[in-house]
Design a protein with these regions (language model features):
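Bacterial N-terminal signal peptides that target proteins for export
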Residues: 1-11
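Bacterial N-terminal signal peptides
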Residues: 9-19
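Solvent-exposed hydroxyl-ligand-binding patches built from regularly spaced Ser/Thr
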Residues: 46, 51-62, 121-133, 137-139
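Sec/Tat-exported extracytoplasmic proteins
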Residues: 49, 103-108, 148-156
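SH3/SH3-like beta-barrel superfamily modules
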Residues: 101-124
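C-terminal partner/receptor-binding element of secreted or periplasmic proteins
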Residues: 123-163
């Protein structure tokens, strides 16, 4: 009888170990080499720096962790443009604010420069990031992090498997 109890305990521990491994595998972040189009909905872009959004301007360009202009961007290096909702007043993104990603689109290898897009949950300030790796093909997560520098962080949502 005791022997059966020990077997039940061993089986329960094995099930817990396998379940824990599966959960850990599902919640692992995508590698930096993965295309940004694979970033899951529910992931967030967290604001780490105080960023002013100028009045009457709907686009802010980012490269290597700083705000820049279209004229100053190195077109052969990763960059993004943040599409802000046009407003007659100056606004700001404050540290700690999270922009929830609802989806991604990709216009791989086209003549359209900003072909990789992170779309955000409806927001009164920011609608999306449009990004370019600076080369033909898709932008990857590592290149996105390079663009963000210390200004933003990507927080990936756990993967949902089988739903």
């Amino acid at each position: 009888m005791r022997f059966l109890r020990h077997i039940a305990v061993v089986v329960a521990l094995a099930v817990l170990a396998v379940g824990s491994t599966i959960v850990n595998a599902q919640s692992a972040d995508l590698p930096d080499s993965a295309p940004i189009a694979t970033i899951g909905a529910g992931s967030t872009v967290s604001v780490n720096a105080d960023i002013l959004l100028p009045a009457n301007q709907g686009t802010i360009y980012l490269q290597a962790g700083s705000v820049t202009t279209w004229e100053q961007i190195d077109k052969k290096a990763p960059s993004c443009r943040l599409n802000a909702v046009e407003s007659p007043v100056v606004r700001r993104l404050v540290p700690g604010r999270k922009l929830v990603i609802t989806g991604t689109t990709q216009n791989n290898g086209s003549v359209f420069f900003y072909g990789d897009v992170l779309q955000f949950e409806e927001d009164a300030t920011v609608s999306q990031f449009q990004c370019s790796p600076g080369h033909k093909g898709a932008m990857n997560i590592g290149e996105l992090k390079q663009v963000f520098g210390g200004m933003f962080s990507l927080i990936q949502a756990p993967a949902v498997v089988g739903e």
